[in-house]
Amino acid sequence: MQLNPSEISELIKSRISEMGVDSQVRNEGTVISVTDGICRVHGLSGVMQGEMLEFPNNTIGLALNLERDSVGAVVLGEYTHIKEGDPVKCTGRILEVPVGPELLGRVVNALGQPIDGKGPINTKLTDFIEKVAPGVIARQSVSQPVQTGLKAIDAMVPIGRGQRELIIGDRQTGKTAVAVDAIINQKGKGVYCVYVAIGQKASTIANVVRKLTELGAMEYTVVVAASASESAAMQYLSAYAGCTMGEYFRDRGEDALIVYDDLTKQAVAYRQISLLLRRPPGREAYPGDVFYLHSRLLERAARVNAEYVEKFTNGAVKGKTGSLTALPIIETQAGDVSAFVPTNVISITDGQIFLETDLFNAGVRPAINAGISVSRVGGAAQTKVIKKLSGGIRTDLAQYRELAAFAQFASDLDEATRKQLERGRRVTELCKQAQYKPLQVWEMAASLYAVNNGYFDDLEVKNVLAFEKGLQDHLKSKYADLVARIEETKDLSKDDEAALRAAIEDYKRSASF
């Protein structure tokens, strides 16, 4: 039998064409070691900083250290099944999380996956968790208020939309309570909220979610939870994930408020990752870039101008500015605000609210130290009526604290000093407020007007809060039109001032104090 060479070549060609081999080019490496959620991978020559890596069983990792002959990656989630010699693939993608209004009312983890047992979240968009903050030209000055509903804050350290206001204090001084009250008070004000819980007990997070649900605040809130049982990587990333979810609203001409509770635990998680990656430690064993860790996060909170919003939405939204207001929380040790992380965050933010253990234990809650709490930009954003009436409050309180220290040693005080001490005691009492009971603008205005004009001076200190509550009920029932006007205009005209004075005097005559 004679074979024709051309037939043989045709036969080989047809067999090759029928094989249908699908070739794939990919960058692949091998796991060298696994320790505490950190994998060292050999290979992956074309990997990017911050790129997502694919480990066996669909486990995701993040490339953080790019070295000469290996890559240091942190595993997001369970890592006990990963072993030496396992293959690792590059995905060519930077870490993203789902964003959009579909997340409102839900509890998610640092990767945007639901953990509240209410089923999947069908978001239409995803966005990068690490983004560059808006530039100088894209920003607009802070000029609109964020009402927290807390007298002590709205009167003395006002917060504006787009501001970063630090809440700092020892453990158990009511830091979370202040932030949660601020979220509750945004109901009906068109501000979307994001609450990021970092390294907290799962029971504490559950309590916050339950309270927000009870008070109807979950409708406009996303909770990003990375509890103490989660890996250090998830705690480190949760703040950036929450920020991206808040930026979705900012970039579309809406207003958003984000609470980071707390950034001390995020810094500790980042320190753990850095030390395991063998990065050189610096002060307090933190890595050299711990300042950048927080600055790049907090700089993303800003008020952006209408041109930025219009450009971002391709002309779909016109004439609206967007804002992301940040309330980072820092926990101090024995009131030491000069430690590394507290000083870093104080220098990044636009002001701070100091909460003190002594005041908290003395029953002054919220336990705000008026002397050293400041708001560097909020004054321009303060509600008109509160700005008019709150000028004397801060001075009265600061002077009272100083005089009270001297008064302990002095036996005979002159009349002016005694009056100032008495006024200070009443102002301190008035600044007390129950948790989950934020006040409306008109309620705050009535209280501030009454204390400024001496209507509390002849009351006993213990009756101040009862008088305030009675006055609010009296105004609501008999002066509803005045209340509505103050609430609508957020200002106090001469006629309204006269009406308010008459209303307070009328109540004082009838009240039994």
From Swiss-Prot:
It is an enzyme of class 7 (translocase). SUPFAM superfamilies: C-terminal domain of alpha and beta subunits of F1 ATP synthase (SSF47917), N-terminal domain of alpha and beta subunits of F1 ATP synthase (SSF50615), P-loop containing nucleoside triphosphate hydrolases (SSF52540). The keyword Secreted does not apply. Keywords: ATP synthesis, ATP-binding, Cell membrane, CF(1), Hydrogen ion transport, Ion transport, Membrane, Nucleotide-binding, Translocase, Transport. Pfam families: ATP-synt_ab, ATP-synt_ab_C, ATP-synt_ab_N. It is found in: Cell membrane. It is a peripheral membrane protein. Its main location: membrane. It catalyses: ATP + H2O + 4 H(+)(in) = ADP + phosphate + 5 H(+)(out). PROSITE patterns: ATPASE_ALPHA_BETA. The record marks 373 as: Required for activity. ATP binds at residues 169-176. One of its GO terms (cellular component) is plasma membrane. Gene3D superfamilies: 2.40.30.20, ATP synthase alpha/beta chain, C-terminal domain, P-loop containing nucleotide triphosphate hydrolases. GO terms for molecular function: ADP binding; ATP binding; proton-transporting ATP synthase activity, rotational mechanism. Its EC number is 7.1.2.2. InterPro entries: ATP_synth_asu-like_sf (IPR023366), ATP_synth_asu_C (IPR000793), ATP_synth_asu_C_sf (IPR038376), ATP_synth_F1_a_nt-bd_dom (IPR033732), ATP_synth_F1_asu (IPR005294), ATPase_a/bsu_AS (IPR020003), ATPase_F1/V1/A1_a/bsu_N (IPR004100), ATPase_F1/V1/A1_a/bsu_N_sf (IPR036121). F-type ATPases have 2 components, CF(1) - the catalytic core - and CF(0) - the membrane proton channel. CF(1) has five subunits: alpha(3), beta(3), gamma(1), delta(1), epsilon(1). CF(0) has three main subunits: a(1), b(2) and c(9-12). The alpha and beta chains form an alternating ring which encloses part of the gamma chain. CF(1) is attached to CF(0) by a central stalk formed by the gamma and epsilon chains, while a peripheral stalk is formed by the delta and b chains. PANTHER family: ATP SYNTHASE SUBUNIT ALPHA, MITOCHONDRIAL. Belongs to the ATPase alpha/beta chains family. Produces ATP from ADP in the presence of a proton gradient across the membrane. The alpha chain is a regulatory subunit. This is ATP synthase subunit alpha. The gene is atpA.
